[in-house]
Amino acid sequence: MSATSATNFAVQTHPVKAPDEEYFFEGAEKLLELWFCSSTQNETRSLRIIPREEIDAMLDIARCKILHSKHNESIDSYVLSESSLFISDNRVILKTCGTTRLLAALPVIMQLAGAYAGLDQVQSVYYSRKNFLRPDLQPSLHKNFDAEVEYLDSFFVDGHAYCLGSLKQDRWYLYTFHREVEFPAHKQPDHTLEILMSDLDEEVLHKFTKDYAVDGNDCFMRAGIDKIIPAGADVHDELFDPCGYSMNAYMNDTDQYATIHVTPEKAFSFASFETNQDLVCLYSQTRKVLQCFRPNKILMTVFANDISEKGKDAQQQLWDRELPGYRRTNVQFVRLETETLVYAHFVRKASTGQDSSSSDEDDGERSD
């Protein structure tokens, strides 16, 4: 999402710029997913009992704000000024765009989990993002992947860092950590699909502006987002002024979620879709996402643990099949500590396949 004006709390503010300095907003998000557990058999509580004021203070450190929230019996969903936050019993997912300082909030999240829920150990960590268009505008902690890895390594021993994709195209960075624990939770099928889209169709971009839609709900229906999200999902969203869109959804009585964020300025257009739902086929849902946004470039990832049949099916289809209208330029398979990952990059068939928007980010092309 993006915005160039501010209210008391709703959007990121931007400093006044010299007349010859062009406006820019980094739509690509930083994504942190943390799974917690206890080091003892003492009674634990849900992360969802962390007080709202503590969550607000944590997000202040990351430089974003809560706009609104919704809840069911399994998950708390927050639409932020810069993307999204989801909290379930033992998992936190924080996704922030722009020039936020996401990793600066990490020690606070860990402290809150121990203090309020008795979850004093991080069992699994996933930090990921694509390459930035303007890494020079990021805070020092996020200017390059080497700096992010060094910071994460200060908390987690034996973490792993990866760079997936061609260095001549958009690429994707991942840091993972997993701790073998004495008292593991009951294992459930788990998978995550993420679609990162850039250079979107101009007709699509206009749909995510105040000139086209009145508010978030109007945008949800008129832009075709309603065709992507499974029927019956509970949705809350925000259409920013003058442009930009964020949406969270969760499936009733589960901790399954979906989130969409759109930066609709033509010079640096970007949209993301992420979900762990298992109600509909992930490959079919992917095709609906692409029909909605019509991007010229796509970066896709699918995580799946060994008991997620739907996740493994999506991985197989991503590995075996082309997406209609697109040419796959790269596909990679990675076996992680507790799951597998398939990464793929696509360009429209009319495109040359070279990412003219790809930055010169010196992100330490490291992989373990």
From Swiss-Prot:
Catalytic activity: S-adenosyl-L-methionine + H(+) = S-adenosyl 3-(methylsulfanyl)propylamine + CO2
Enzyme class: lyase
Cofactor: pyruvate
PTM per Swiss-Prot/TrEMBL: Is synthesized initially as an inactive proenzyme. Formation of the active enzyme involves a self-maturation process in which the active site pyruvoyl group is generated from an internal serine residue via an autocatalytic post-translational modification. Two non-identical subunits are generated from the proenzyme in this reaction, and the pyruvate is formed at the N-terminus of the alpha chain, which is derived from the carboxyl end of the proenzyme.
Pathway where this protein functions: Amine and polyamine biosynthesis; S-adenosylmethioninamine biosynthesis; S-adenosylmethioninamine from S-adenosyl-L-methionine: step 1/1
One of the protein's GO biological processes: spermine biosynthetic process
Keywords: Autocatalytic cleavage, Decarboxylase, Lyase, Polyamine biosynthesis, Pyruvate, S-adenosyl-L-methionine, Schiff base, Spermidine biosynthesis, Zymogen
Pyruvic acid (Ser) PTM sites in chain numbering: 83
E.C. designation(s): 4.1.1.50
Phenotype of null mutants: Reduced body size as compared to wild-type with the production of fewer progeny. Reduced spermidine levels, but increased putrescine accumulation. Double knockout with the polyamine transporter catp-5 results in a reduced brood size, delayed postembryonic development, and a more marked reduction in spermidine levels and a more marked increase in putrescine accumulation as compared to the single mutants.
GO cellular component: cytosol
Active site: residue positions: 26, 29, 83 (schiff-base intermediate with substrate), 97 (proton donor), 246 (proton acceptor), 261 (proton acceptor)
Name assigned to this protein: S-adenosylmethionine decarboxylase proenzyme
Species of origin: Caenorhabditis elegans
The encoding gene: smd-1
